[in-house]
Amino acid sequence: MSILSYFQQQRLTLQSGTALPAAQSLLTLAGQGELEATLNPKPDAAALLAAIEQAYQDGYEQQASTEFELQGIAFAGSGDPLLALELLSQVLPAFKAQRHGVPVTLVTYGLVAAAEAEQLCQQLIALEVERLEIYLPAANPPAYQQAVKPLQYGFAEVCQFIHAAAEAGLQVSCFAFAPAEQPAEIRALARELGARELLILQPEK
């Protein structure tokens, strides 16, 4: 059976297709290949909205007493949500109409053409995306190239996108998987670019 949603650190997370800008999915890097194998490769908007609604009916986030405690929903899965904008543009307006004030996060490589970064950020804001979690496993181009193996763009573009997103008013966090090389340098770079924090996540064994 293929699924459309799962819980990652207790947050409802949705599959966003299979298009990737790099050699491997972030789920694979997180050691979650088994989960990835169960995800529906071609999610459609109606099915995603139904999966979200079902999670809320089953009690998701009922413990949150204020908006500030809401984790909301995230788009991640076996693809990169920035390469699934058409799907997001079908899901998010309907979701926000039903659940106003619930935050939306995209978990992404952030590999975007520098010339398109600003416009893309405005598009995300128009879709009421509040947060971005961007994979930043290195603080220099060679180490980034080795860690990510991007199919298009690279270190300069991800740095530009982090900066553009923070400037546009999106809440940006960066993350890497343990054991990260030079975490202090990555954290300093992330902060310099405008990210709020660098999270070092433990991959599943």
Where are each of the predicted segments found?
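Auxiliary Fe-S-binding modules of radical SAM enzymes
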Residues: S2-Q8, G17, Y60, I73, ...
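Core AdoMet radical
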Residues: T38-A47, Q63-A84, Q98-E116, V129-E157, ...
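Well-ordered, non-membrane alpha-helical segments in soluble/globular domains
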Residues: A45-I52, Q90-V91, F155-F161
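Conserved mixed alpha/beta catalytic, RNA-binding, or beta-rich assembly cores of soluble enzyme
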Residues: D58-G72, L87, L92-P93, L124
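Distinct, well-ordered alpha-helical segments
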Residues: L85-S89, A115-I125, A184-I186
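Surface-exposed amphipathic alpha-helices with a cationic face
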Residues: S89-R99, I125, I162-G169, R191
